[in-house]
Amino acid sequence: MAKEFSRTRRIAQQLQQELAVVLQRDMKDPRIGFVTVNDVDVSRDLSYAKVFVTFFEEDEKLVQEKVEALDAAAGYIRSLVAGRMKLRVMPELRFIYDSSLVEGMRMSNLVSRVISDDEAKQQEHGTVENAKQDGDKAEDDK
């Protein structure tokens, strides 16, 4: 039976925290800008780590440039994180753009728009139905 929190998962969590701090405080590359580390997936032998990141940018070209800048600085970032963590082997970092946050926000906006449109239609039809009911009452009074 596997442990509830495996060593690789604990290392991935700590690596995510340390990467977030390093990218926020120590990276001076203007191409990268504000980056969020969503998740880190570490291989079983701790030789590789997939770092899932998001940016405020939605333009695919800018996102690709930022990911390439992170990949170019991966060795430097790895050395900074290695100084903060006590590991015998520091995983090689691979940065991957995670579009799930952007897609989630887009879906949430679509749902909100549909709900507001539906409420507007209900109010419009409710007003028309009330006017019809008032008209029916006026005819009954005659």
Swiss-Prot record:
Keywords, comma-separated and alphabetical: Cytoplasm, Ribosome biogenesis
Localisation per UniProt entry: Cytoplasm
GO cellular component, one term: cytosol
Pfam family, one: RBFA
Primary location group: cytoplasm
Disulphide-bridged cysteine pairs: none
GO biological process entries: maturation of SSU-rRNA
Record carries keyword Hydrolase: no
Keyword Cytoplasm: yes
Gene3D superfamilies the record matches: 3.30.300.20
UniProt xrefs under PROSITE patterns: RBFA (PS01319)
Gene Ontology molecular functions: ribosomal small subunit binding
HAMAP family: RbfA
NCBIfam families: rbfA (TIGR00082)
Family, as annotated: Belongs to the RbfA family.
Main function: One of several proteins that assist in the late maturation steps of the functional core of the 30S ribosomal subunit. Associates with free 30S ribosomal subunits (but not with 30S subunits that are part of 70S ribosomes or polysomes). Required for efficient processing of 16S rRNA. May interact with the 5'-terminal helix region of 16S rRNA.
Self-association state and partner proteins as the record states: Monomer. Binds 30S ribosomal subunits, but not 50S ribosomal subunits or 70S ribosomes.
Protein name: Ribosome-binding factor A
Species lineage: Bacteria, Pseudomonadati, Pseudomonadota, Gammaproteobacteria, Alteromonadales
Gene name of this polypeptide: rbfA
